[in-house]
Amino acid sequence: MITLRKLPIALAVAAGVLSTQAMAVDFHGYARSGIGWTASGGEQQCFQTTGAQSKYRLGNECETYAELKLGQELWKEGDKSFYLDTNVAYSVSQRDDWESTDPAFREANVQGKNLIESLPGSTIWAGKRFYQRHDVHMIDFYYWDISGPGAGLETIDLGFGKLSVAATRNSESGGSSAWIDNQRENAKYTINNVYDVRLAGLETNPGGSLELGVDYGRADTQEGYSLAPNASKDGVMLTAEHTQSLMGGFNKFVVQYATDSMTSYNTGHSQGTSVNNNGHLLRVIDHGAINLAEKWDMMYVALYQDIDLDNNNGNTWYSVGVRPMYKWTPIMSTLLEAGYDNVKSQHTGERNGQYKLTLAQQWQAGDSIWSRPAIRVFATYANWDEKWGYSDTTGVAQDGTIGTNSRGKNNEVTFGAQFEAWW
């Protein structure tokens, strides 16, 4: 029993322990928000080529978005540890003061490091997780991303490289059916499992390394349920990525090939219940960020992606862009982003094209093109000519703007201010 005399001491010790634990909580995240206008009137418009899977993002983001991550090392003994990581994401239209939205629970996982004596340096994990994602920042395009609920063992040291294995899951609405009480009933959802194997850190040349990956995705129906007869069911995605240190930064060269269920989402997620994604995908990307001179940095990307589908509803996407940055002082810079997208329809043979230019004056926490937080004012000009779009009723590509999501031919100017931060 704690006497009254000892109570203040006990409370002080407890407060100290709780304070230490509170200080150990890691707070990380990403956020962006701002305000913008369109020269012809109204709120800021954003510009993305019909058929392209992303857009050049500088001065071309029309939403408030945030990811708030809380994590803590829950236990540590020597080099062994358990770490809890969570992430809640929000996205709203940034039109009003009060904008309510349901948050997306993106991550909740525990990672155990060095728990397997025979595999020093490895990490075992389970839960929802952003898993080893690969992206092109300037177009916000995640080309290798199997994130979701899952489990795995990563960074197994083989001597010549690091091996990682994982299984993750996502679902499709409906997708399968069964005879129940003498009638056909559709499932509310059908899950897709992805099995991922990666070998990273393969030294190829001075300053260069190679990462190889295989992803197999398959629809997994409930007992008694079956997919449509012509559903893609499963597919494979192969990835090879070479990373080279270059001019104070890096260059990444990526080649990916995918089949059937792995073609429609084409970042690593599977859609095996679909009847419209049998075919194959080939993607080649070269992107990076370099230091050109004492006061100059630059991001760049060149992308080719061909989705050849059996139903003739695929497309071929070309994209090229640069974002040079001139640093007036260690905390103030000017950026120019120039990007061009062109998408050819497999069905119609027609093309959609757009070029987009953004000039931004920026104040950032440091003199790197990656320095954040940043506050920027910007002006954007976009010019597009679209010959085809996807039908509003069937989803099949067709010529013209009537009854499709084609934007036709036009141009526009927008301007505004935005902050962006990661921490």
UniProtKB/Swiss-Prot annotation:
GO terms for cellular component: cell outer membrane; pore complex
SUPFAM superfamilies: Porins
Summary of the function given for this chain in its UniProt record: Involved in the transport of maltose and maltodextrins.
Family recorded in the similarity comment: Belongs to the porin LamB (TC 1.B.3) family.
GO BP term, example: polysaccharide transport
Reaction(s) catalysed by this chain's protein: beta-maltose(in) = beta-maltose(out)
InterPro entries: G_neg_Bact_CarbUptk_Porin, Maltoporin, Porin_LamB, Porin_LamB_sf
Full protein name: Maltoporin 1
Regions crossing the membrane: none
Domain of life where this protein originates: Bacteria
Top-level taxonomy: Bacteria, Pseudomonadati, Pseudomonadota, Gammaproteobacteria, Enterobacterales
Induction: By maltose.
Major localisation: membrane
CDD domains: Maltoporin-like
Subunit note: Homotrimer formed of three 18-stranded antiparallel beta-barrels, containing three independent channels.
UniProt-listed HAMAP family: LamB
Pfam families with a match to the protein in the record: LamB (PF02264)
Membrane topology type: Multi-pass membrane protein
Gene Ontology molecular function terms on file: carbohydrate transmembrane transporter activity; maltodextrin transmembrane transporter activity; maltose transporting porin activity; porin activity
Residues annotated as site: Important in sugar transport: 142
Signal peptide (from-to): 1-24
Annotated compartments: Cell outer membrane
Annotated site (Greasy slide, important in sugar transport): 30, 65, 98, 250, 370, 422
Sorted UniProt keywords: Cell outer membrane, Ion transport, Membrane, Porin, Signal, Sugar transport, Transmembrane, Transmembrane beta strand, Transport
